[in-house]
UniProtKB/Swiss-Prot annotation:
Keyword set includes Zinc: yes
Protein name: Zinc-type alcohol dehydrogenase-like protein SERP1785
Classification via PROSITE patterns: QOR_ZETA_CRYSTAL
Family to which this protein belongs: Belongs to the zinc-containing alcohol dehydrogenase family. Quinone oxidoreductase subfamily.
Organism listed in the record: Staphylococcus epidermidis (strain ATCC 35984 / DSM 28319 / BCRC 17069 / CCUG 31568 / BM 3577 / RP62A)
Pfam families, per the entry: ADH_N, ADH_zinc_N
InterPro entries recorded: ADH-like_C (IPR013149), ADH-like_N (IPR013154), ADH_Zn_typ-1 (IPR014182), GroES-like_sf (IPR011032), NAD(P)-bd_dom_sf (IPR036291), PKS_ER (IPR020843), Quin_OxRdtase/zeta-crystal_CS (IPR002364), YIM1/Zinc_Alcohol_DH_Fams (IPR050700)
Keywords, alphabetical: Metal-binding, Oxidoreductase, Zinc
GO molecular function, one term: zinc ion binding
Length: 336
């Protein structure tokens, strides 16, 4: 089978160091599924992983995937051959930038039947990240009426995570405030369901006042935590929650959180599969809920760009686009 990977980490300005490899098709065992990959989504985590040291070469990236189950392990109980599934995988295994992939069943759910594979591929990683942040970190209720009066600020509402997080938060009853700056990103964020869209290139505190917003219960940062850290501390309500998916690049003063008793959390969606936590089945459960909501018409996919064919050039192009920070929604590559 064909796989696209690299032997050592590289920056894009070094040229295209992706290579095509030919591997034997693996055989599933235990709770593993063998999936014939149809579509993948490329995420910022792919570009970051590409620049990190390679422990075992070649390194095959890729997290989001949609595909058909070809074979199942002898302990699989939730799926059967022929099921169309989607998932986001784990960094400690070969990724989805290959024709066939082994994946454990508790990280997988059946894909929405009303979506094409290139649409469904936009949802697993960002959807899981949003679900974990909203339910596990912020602790919002799964009963929308109980979230009435609660508010959420999403930094970078038009990105992949922000786009699906807006839809999920709106479904579960939160008032959603997002940030965007370009006309197209503002329009996109509104279409995703944002109640208020603020310009992150202008003073957010003043815009809160202009929109009669006294503070928010939750802040979800999906872009440049260092830039927004002090601002988020100022905008969150006392005893509120701040979560980020972007690591600090410089030292920040956690004591700023003290006077308001603010909870600050680094959300890393892969922590469950990486550490084999007892509740790793939540990935399956959250993806299953996403499928149900999509099929019922409550969530929409966030794919905005599709590249046909997985090869070294198309993958390099995808990484270039993501590193330009110009994407709205998600970028998907079709293998079929």
């Amino acid at each position: 089978m064909k796989a696209i990977g690299f032997k050592s980490s590289f920056q894009l300005d070094e040229g295209n160091c992706f290579e095509e490899f030919n591997f034997d098709i693996p055989h599933p065992s235990g709770h593993e599924l063998l999936v014939k990959v149809q579509s993948i989504s490329v995420n910022p985590v792919d570009t970051k992983q590409r620049t990190m040291p390679v422990d075992k070469a070649p390194r095959v990236l890729g997290f989001d995937a949609v595909g058909v189950i070809e074979k199942i392990g002898d302990q699989v109980s939730m799926f059967q051959e022929g099921d169309v599934v989607f998932y986001s995988g784990s960094p400690n295994q070969n990724g989805s930038n290959e024709e066939y992939q082994l994946i454990e069943e508790y990280l997988v759910a059946k894909a929405p039947t009303n979506l094409k594979s290139e649409q469904a591929a936009s949802l697993p990683l960002t959807g899981l990240t949003a679900y974990e942040t909203l339910f596990d970190v912020f602790g919002i209720s799964k009963e929308p009426s109980e979230n009435k009066g609660k508010s959420l600020l999403i930094i970078n509402g038009a990105g992949g995570v922000g786009s699906i997080a807006t839809q999920i938060a709106k479904f579960y009853g939160l008032k959603v405030i997002t940030t965007a700056s370009r006309e197209d990103t503002i329009k996109w964020s509104v279409n995703m369901g944002a109640d208020v869209v603020l310009n992150h290139k202008k003073d957010l505190s003043q815009q809160f006042k202009d929109n009669h917003i006294e503070g928010v219960d939750y802040i979800f940062c999906t872009f440049d935590t260092d830039m927004y850290y002090e601002m988020m501390v100022n905008l969150v309500k006392p005893r509120g929650h701040i979560a980020t998916i972007v690591a600090f690049n410089s030292q920040q003063d956690l004591n700023l959180l003290k006077s308001k008793s603010v909870t600050f959390t680094h959300e890393f969606m892969f922590s469950r599969p990486l550490h084999h936590t007892d509740d790793v089945i939540k990935h399956h459960e959250y993806l299953k809920d996403i499928t149900e909501k999509v099929e019922q018409g409550y969530y929409q996919p966030t794919t905005t760009k599709v590249i046909d064919g997985l090869d070294v050039d198309s993958l390099y192009e995808a990484h270039q686009i993501l590193e330009s920070h110009s994407m709205i929604g998600k970028l998907v590559i079709n293998l079929k």
